[in-house]
Amino acid sequence: MKLNRSNFSEFKKYPEKILQFGEGNFLRAFVDWQVDRMNKAADFNAGVVIVQPLEQGLVDMLNEQDGLYTLYLQGLKEGKAVKEHSVIDCVTRGLNPYTQYEEYLKLAENPEMEIVISNTTEAGIAFDENDKLGRTCQNSYPGKLTAFLYRRFKTFNGDKSKGMLIIPCELIDRNGEKLKATILKFAELWNLEKEFADWIEEANTFCCTLVDRIVPGYPRDTIEEVHAELGYEDSLVDVGEQFHLWVIEGPEWIKDILPFEKAGVNIQVVKDVTPYRTRKVRILNGAHTALVPVAYLYGLDTVGHSVEDKVIGKYLTELVYDEIIPTLDLPEEELKYFAGAVLERFLNPFVNHYLMSIALNSMPKFETRDLPSLLEYKKRKGQLPKKLVFSLAALIEFYKGKRGDEDIKLADGEDILELYKDLWSKFDGTDACYRNIVETVLGYEKNWKMNLNELEGLTDAVTENLIKIDKLGMKEAVKSVM
């Protein structure tokens, strides 16, 4: 039996209020799940029309199931491993604007439409000068949205109360601002009246956002077991972790439109998304990158096993709480709560997150994710953070390319791999040689955007740690910073 509204008549059809660009796993497991929760727990009463941003997509499959699909959420919830599933029923239909262009534009004539959501990948918010305003669909997402907004502007004669709340989820910095700027470029390219540009500025609200949920997506390897468990066929099963966070930079009145507090979903409306983005990069991504060389050389292979390990788990926890959190400008309790949630996510028993999959481009990752914490810690405390410095030394050892007798498959820029190959191939075991390796790596300004040898005490500390790691092995060396 197939999942659709004929076979399952208990599902409600909601009035269409949300236009969503993107039908992929992430939006369905993140935004649509939250809309579903708000519908069921807070009487949001909002239906989502999904527009596929590319010619090839899933809307035909979505329409075959009348917008219904099953979402599994699996991971740790308040310390317990939880796997739960539900049918999401907020999607009313899907449209392919390449074959249904006029039907797509007609959505703009619906006075109840009030929100635009999108996730068209990092490359999606782009200006395409070949896009035209005519009878055929534009290629770019901002081009399509400009055409939609222009139809709305014309239909309602520039009524300022008919503007949209526009919330892009693309993983680029200042995504709302970039989308708005691109739309205004199209207004100029198409020679649209100045009143339209004014209406875009004054009647519409573009929000910058940060989204956070790991979504493995369609469970290809276990789909037969999933269908057997469900008792029906679903071609759009989706899988996400329990944790979710949606930070929206925008006005307070968004809380009146999205009843997230009543529904118990983790949406935060803030004045500035920047510290939240910094928090995620420094704590979540920074913890990953600082962990990899230490845990891998210790003999561990996954993030979960690393956090479970008595020594490495303690090392990582202390690194996050004692060395990263003190460098961030958000309320301490909020940072500690976020860090606790991150470490819990790392323990997700349903996901095998391999250290080597995170190890890709570790040098530039350390520069963007961990170096800012190291520098800020030194600035605020007047001393170096022991564990971040140790992780940096472990990174240099990692790029030796050996774990015991096995080779490490290093993956980084050609220049970085050459640098390390040259340094370690000339290694003669003397303390002077260790120091030369450290000085050369820390002085590689192309990666660090500065000469790290100029940071007081860093060259000595990294050299001392590198000697311990290389001579004693990671299991012994890590004890010195605990």
Swiss-Prot record:
One of its GO terms (biological process) is D-galacturonate catabolic process. Pathway: Carbohydrate metabolism; pentose and glucuronate interconversion. Keywords: NAD, Oxidoreductase. Coiled coil: none annotated. The keyword Membrane does not apply. It catalyses: D-altronate + NAD(+) = keto-D-tagaturonate + NADH + H(+). Pfam families: Mannitol_dh, Mannitol_dh_C. InterPro entries: 6-PGluconate_DH-like_C_sf (IPR008927), 6PGD_dom2 (IPR013328), Altronate_OxRdtase (IPR023668), Mannitol_DH (IPR000669), Mannitol_DH_C (IPR013118), Mannitol_DH_N (IPR013131), NAD(P)-bd_dom_sf (IPR036291). It is an enzyme of class 1 (oxidoreductase). The keyword NAD applies. GO terms for molecular function: mannitol-1-phosphate 5-dehydrogenase activity; tagaturonate reductase activity. NCBIfam families: PRK03643.1. HAMAP family: Altron_oxidoreduct. Belongs to the mannitol dehydrogenase family. UxaB subfamily. This is Altronate oxidoreductase. The gene is uxaB.
